[in-house]
Swiss-Prot record:
4-aspartylphosphate sites (modified residues): 733
Matches recorded under NCBIfam families: PRK11466.1, TMAO_torS
Periplasmic face of the membrane: 30-332
UniProt protein name: Sensor protein TorS
Response regulatory domain span: 683-798
Coiled coil start-end: none
Effect of residue 860 to Q: Decrease in activity
Protein's membrane topology: Multi-pass membrane protein
InterPro entries: CheY-like_superfamily, HAMP_dom, HATPase_C_sf, His_kinase_dom, HisK_dim/P_dom, HisK_dim/P_sf, HPT_dom_sf, Sensor_TorS
One Gene Ontology molecular-function label: phosphorelay sensor kinase activity
Amino acid sequence: MNLTLTRRLWMGFALMALLTLTSTLVGWYNLRFISQVEKDNTQALIPTMNMARQLSEASAWELFAAQNLTSADNEKMWQAQGRMLTAQSLKINALLQALREQGFDTTAIEQQEQEISRSLRQQGELVGQRLQLRQQQQQLSQQIVAAADEIARLAQGQANNATTSAGATQAGIYDLIEQDQRQAAESALDRLIDIDLEYVNQMNELRLSALRVQQMVMNLGLEQIQKNAPTLEKQLNNAVKILQRRQIRIEDPGVRAQVATTLTTVSQYSDLLALYQQDSEISNHLQTLAQNNIAQFAQFSSEVSQLVDTIELRNQHGLAHLEKASARGQYSLLLLGMVSLCALILILWRVVYRSVTRPLAEQTQALQRLLDGDIDSPFPETAGVRELDTIGRLMDAFRSNVHALNRHREQLAAQVKARTAELQELVIEHRQARAEAEKASQAKSAFLAAMSHEIRTPLYGILGTAQLLADNPALNAQRDDLRAITDSGESLLTILNDILDYSAIEAGGKNVSVSDEPFEPRPLLESTLQLMSGRVKGRPIRLATAIADDMPCALMGDPRRIRQVITNLLSNALRFTDEGYIILRSRTDGEQWLVEVEDSGCGIDPAKLAEIFQPFVQVSGKRGGTGLGLTISSRLAQAMGGELSATSTPEVGSCFCLRLPLRVATAPVPKTVNQAVRLDGLRLLLIEDNPLTQRITIEMLKTSGAQIVAVGNAAQALETLQNSEPFAAALVDFDLPDIDGITLARQLAQQYPSLVLIGFSAHVIDETLRQRTSSLFRGIIPKPVPREVLGQLLAHYLQLQVNNDQSLDVSQLNEDAQLMGTEKIHEWLVLFTQHALPLLDEIDIARASQDSEKIKRAAHQLKSSCSSLGMHIASQLCAQLEQQPLSAPLPHEEITRSVAALEAWLHKKDLNAI
């Protein structure tokens, strides 16, 4: 039978689906049976267990409430316990009814519950009666106590009156005795004794009897009544009789009537005793009921326990039934799974493998041979599969198409080869054009570099000679001429630098370097204006600054480039201002720093304002200049993230505004000390082929105490180093007659590793040159260079110490020594060496592991320690390290230098003290 591949697969899948459906139905039936058994057991067992537990809890609560009911001493507690008993009784009855509906025999428990309920109702009624009796006892007792107190008060009043009367009679007796009326005095004395004093005693007895009755009533209690009721009644009866007898002897009719009325209330003591007697009887009855309740509850608990045992037995039977049903379901599912697995294997082998998989594998191998290039390979038998027959016919058609495509591909290959040859010719032409452009650019750069070198070298001779001549006292008369030579040379150097900056900007700005360091804006502006002040001498021009008070003390940026831009703006203002003023302003505007140069010069036509920032554009050719200053300044402002703009009014003046991002510096500004550098005893090797440059450099360095040996080429340098004493450093010119300076530096670095190499060149020192020579030279000194700058750069590159006292705040140390003595500073230095210096090792370890928090803590401790010992530069470096723990320079060298300086300062102090 020639079935299609789809039908064969459908047949196999249908058989597997039927097998899956059968397994599902059998499994569903077993699970449903187990679920039904579990449901029946759950519905029957769990509720009965819960009801048994609730029944036990309810009986316990009922017993607890019954005990509390007996001891209830107020109506609120009595009602609360009664409600609890009622609720628990109803709950027990409901649970018993539910258990009875489940088929349990609860007759004995119900009868026991009925007896307990009757006993509890009787107990509740007795407790209520007892509460009423005690309320009546309290009210009657309070009335009797109040009446007795009133009698005592009235008796006290009568006694006081009688005492007053007796006092008057006594006074009269004394008068009669003085009048010698003996008989009258004796008669008055008899009356005093027989009547007045006797009456006082009777009233006092009345008061005491009333207080005794009051005390007896107040001391009455249930326990006393139960023990000695007849005696208490007799004592109260005697006391009341005394009160009644003394009441008759009261002379005042009104008081006597009032006491008689009050005695009526006191006479109700017998009723009070009767109430206490009833209370005692009820309490005894309640005690008997409580004991009976305990016995009944014990019997009730026994019946409940038997019921719980019955429930547990039924639950065990239900669980056993559930386990049997579960086991039967597991066995049936296991058997069905094995049968299904066998049937599935048979279906996969017979339908899928023989009819589908194996023919497809053979067909795939044939197709792979076809793809590998064996186009004439035969196809296997299709085993009567319609789709595979179709694939065979398609492959025959594919063979024909492949032969046609091969012929077409050969034709296309010939066309592509021709086109490729044409493209290669175009690429060669393009490369030649680009090479010519690059060659022209390199020639331009080489020309500028050569011109820079050729101009800077004689400029160094001019400026250096002028500076040396200016130091000669014999030439004071020609000082103005020397100043003119120096100014002209510096102007020429400025023009040369402008041309080089413009060349770098025109090349895309790759060689225009902009630094980012902290600086102080106010001193920078003031010093720049001060440098320009010499150019206004003898001219009617006023230079002024207007720096806002809210200017930050320190900013981040490139102070050298900012000074260059401002100097250019001030130079233009001086060039175009004949008289009036030039004001340098500085202020902040939001997140920007504004520097303005305003003048009262000739002004600029508004139509030309847009052109003045273009290269080689001049407002007036009569004023001089190259026309590059504003172009360079504008591009430098852009490189620093700002802009340069201008406003002007002809014949009024102009205002140029430099806008830069306002970034307040968090690190301290390094302090610079402008003083002469001493290089005493320092041996330097000068490798320079220009004799004039040699002579000027030697003369400049001799004034600082250095020992200079000059050679003219690389061979002489190598010979001198080999035959002479060691040199501290070598100044290497880049252009030497035999080999270039960089190649010589590589040889010197290999042969003399301890020799410090310093570049000394008139070449353009751009970023590319610095990167090429950074591994060879400690630094590069450009020519021309002033004498002071030359000495400072040498000291910097050689890491010399200009003045040890610069590392210390001497005034602070002097004050501390005056207040506490140098011995204390010695102790501080020892503590600093023991505890602070080890922090430097911790900083190195933390810097290696990039642990910024640990660096901050150590830097903060070092900052405080350095500040306390007057090491102000080291303290600033530590503060900078605390702010920038992973990028700031390390203070190790400065701290070592400061410790040495402090030791020298202390040694000097000790010598002075001796």
